[in-house]
């Protein structure tokens, strides 16, 4: 498996209403995309920065021997 399991979870804003800009990994495009997080609930596919998302979910598949 190339990515951590939580990278495949859908973006989940949770049940609260804080409307915080966050990033999630989109496996279909192999890119990190912005979404708005409510501040509670949700899942682990939720990163404060695009770089953190990229390092965790995109870069984890790069540079591995085939």
Curated annotation (Swiss-Prot):
Cellular compartments per GO CC: extracellular space
Q: Does the keyword Plastid apply?
A: no
Read off the PROSITE patterns from this record: BPTI_KUNITZ_1, BPTI_KUNITZ_2
Q: List the disulfide bonds.
A: 7-57, 16-40, 32-53
The compartments listed are: Secreted
Which residues are annotated with the PTM Pyrrolidone carboxylic acid?
1
Q: Which InterPro entries does the protein's record reference?
A: Kunitz_BPTI (IPR002223), Kunitz_BPTI_sf (IPR036880), Prtase_inh_Kunz-CS (IPR020901), TFPI/VKTCI-like (IPR050098)
What Pfam families would the database entry show? Answer: Kunitz_BPTI
User: In what tissue types does this protein appear?
Assistant: Expressed by the venom gland.
Instruction: Tell me which residues are marked as the site Reactive bond for trypsin.
Output: 17-18
Q: Which GO terms describe its molecular function?
A: serine-type endopeptidase inhibitor activity; toxin activity
Q: BPTI/Kunitz inhibitor domain location, by residue?
A: 7-57
Q: Which UniProt keywords apply?
A: Disulfide bond, Protease inhibitor, Pyrrolidone carboxylic acid, Secreted, Serine protease inhibitor, Toxin
The domain of life is Eukaryota
Question: Which positions carry the propeptide annotation?
Answer: 62-66
Q: What does this protein do?
A: Serine protease inhibitor.
Similarity comment: Belongs to the venom Kunitz-type family.
Protein name, per record: Kunitz-type serine protease inhibitor Vur-KIn
Q: Which organism is it from?
A: Vipera renardi (Steppe viper)
